[in-house]
Amino acid sequence: ADDYDDEVLPDARGHRPIDRKREELPSLRPAPPPISGGGYR
């Protein structure tokens, strides 16, 4: 059940196969702020 788990629905489970490439530089641009407050500006 672990063989096809990663190749059947990688993005469906939220493994972010394409995101892992862009997440290489998460510190480069703080565009997506983890704070939902929006008042820390």
Swiss-Prot record:
It is found in: Secreted. One of its GO terms (molecular function) is protein-folding chaperone binding. The record marks R13, G14 as: Cleavage. The keyword Glycosyltransferase does not apply. One of its GO terms (biological process) is adaptive immune response. Conversion of fibrinogen to fibrin is triggered by thrombin, which cleaves fibrinopeptides A and B from alpha and beta chains, and thus exposes the N-terminal polymerization sites responsible for the formation of the soft clot. Its main location: secreted. The keyword Membrane does not apply. Residues 14-16 are annotated as: Beta-chain polymerization, binding distal domain of another fibrin. The modification Sulfotyrosine is found at Y4. Keywords: Adaptive immunity, Blood coagulation, Coiled coil, Disulfide bond, Hemostasis, Immunity, Innate immunity, Secreted, Sulfation. One of its GO terms (cellular component) is extracellular region. Residues 10-26 have a biased composition (Basic and acidic residues). Heterohexamer; disulfide linked. Contains 2 sets of 3 non-identical chains (alpha, beta and gamma). The 2 heterotrimers are in head to head conformation with the N-termini in a small central domain. Cleaved by the protease thrombin to yield monomers which, together with fibrinogen alpha (FGA) and fibrinogen gamma (FGG), polymerize to form an insoluble fibrin matrix. Fibrin has a major function in hemostasis as one of the primary components of blood clots. In addition, functions during the early stages of wound repair to stabilize the lesion and guide cell migration during re-epithelialization. Was originally thought to be essential for platelet aggregation, based on in vitro studies using anticoagulated blood. This is Fibrinogen beta chain. It comes from Oryctolagus cuniculus. The gene is FGB.
